[in-house]
From Swiss-Prot:
Identification of the protein by name: Cytochrome c oxidase subunit 3
Topological region Mitochondrial intermembrane: 35-40, 106-128, 184-190, 257-261
Membrane association type: Multi-pass membrane protein
Family of the protein in this entry: Belongs to the cytochrome c oxidase subunit 3 family.
InterPro entries with a match to the protein in the record: Cyt_c/ubiquinol_Oxase_su3, Cyt_c_oxase_su3_dom, Cyt_c_oxidase-like_su3, Cyt_c_oxidase_su3-like_sf, Cyt_c_oxidase_su3_a-hlx
Subcellular location: Mitochondrion inner membrane
Entry's transmembrane regions: 16-34, 41-66, 73-105, 129-152, 156-183, 191-223, 233-256
Gene3D superfamilies: 1.10.287.70, Cytochrome c oxidase, subunit III, four-helix bundle
Source organism of this protein record: Damaliscus lunatus (Tsessebe)
Any one Gene Ontology BP term: respiratory chain complex IV assembly
Length: 261
């Protein structure tokens, strides 16, 4: 589309939804191959395809919004509804994991020893690394709000500082989570406790990585003066997503780490 004479969202034909779906298939298949056959070839191919898709799709959206001016107020309204529905779908996604956890923990079967945590499982101390992780994510929630308010007030330097702090806290959280996984006294194959713990916290960790990537893109866009105090939906969507990640972690901490231990 070279010229647009209306306010509505008419997108160009794009291959990226198809390559994104293909990369998701390759990654999930690759994860199974890695778990069962210790082969990471398919997983690496999926990750590479996914990163290329992300780069090119983001590039196209930035070009359409910032340089071609296609993101009118009507288009932004549609994108807001889309992001809200996406976050609602993510809430339902995590609801499934919490359902699995509570289904197993509220009425433990004789195979689990009739208790929770199951016999033989030594849970992680919720007052050590998990509590630090909670503090880190809550602090990142404060800094992303600071960044948002700075952007709305036109304070570019404060916005960049706050956004950088948020990204650093997100990376720190990921490193802490990785070290916790490495030192955990149980694995994903240790029955229903191990599987619910690693799948729920692992998918949350994946969302933190996705959110951090989203914020890094926003950071470089802000360096190039892409956002104004009235036109910054890309950053707003990233902030909404980050707050969602924060809230999910609080539920995970209270349910799996604290109550579940």
């Amino acid at each position: 589309m070279t010229h647009q004479t209306h306010a509505y969202h008419m997108v160009n034909p794009s291959p990226w939804p198809l390559t994104g779906a293909l990369s998701a298939l390759l990654m999930t298949s690759g994860l199974i191959m890695w778990f069962h056959f210790n082969s990471m070839t398919l997983l690496m191919l999926g990750l590479t395809t996914n990163m290329l898709t992300m780069y090119q799709w983001w590039r196209d959206i930035i070009r359409e919004s910032t340089f071609q001016g296609h993101h009118t107020s009507a288009v932004q309204k549609g994108l807001r509804y889309g992001m809200i529905l996406f976050i609602i779908s993510e809430v339902l996604f995590f609801t499934g994991f919490f359902w699995a956890f509570y289904h197993s923990s509220l009425a433990p079967t004789p195979e689990l020893g009739g208790c929770w945590p199951p016999t033989g499982i030594h849970p992680l101390n919720p007052l050590e690394v998990p509590l630090l992780n909670t503090s880190v994510l809550l602090a990142s929630g404060v800094s992303i709000t600071w960044a948002h308010h700075s952007l709305m007030e036109g304070n570019r330097n404060h916005m960049l500082q706050a956004l950088f702090i948020t990204i650093a806290l997100g990376v720190y959280f990921t490193l802490l989570q990785a070290s916790e996984y490495y030192e955990a006294p149980f694995t994903i194959s240790d029955g229903v406790y191990g599987s619910t713990f690693f799948v729920a916290t692992g998918f949350h960790g994946l969302h933190v990585i996705i959110g951090s990537t989203f914020l890094i893109v926003c950071f470089f866009r802000q360096l190039k003066f892409h956002f104004t105090s009235t036109h910054h939906f890309g950053f707003e969507a990233a902030a909404w997503y980050w707050h969602f990640v924060d809230v999910v972690w609080l539920f995970l901490y209270v349910s799996i780490y604290w109550w579940g231990s």
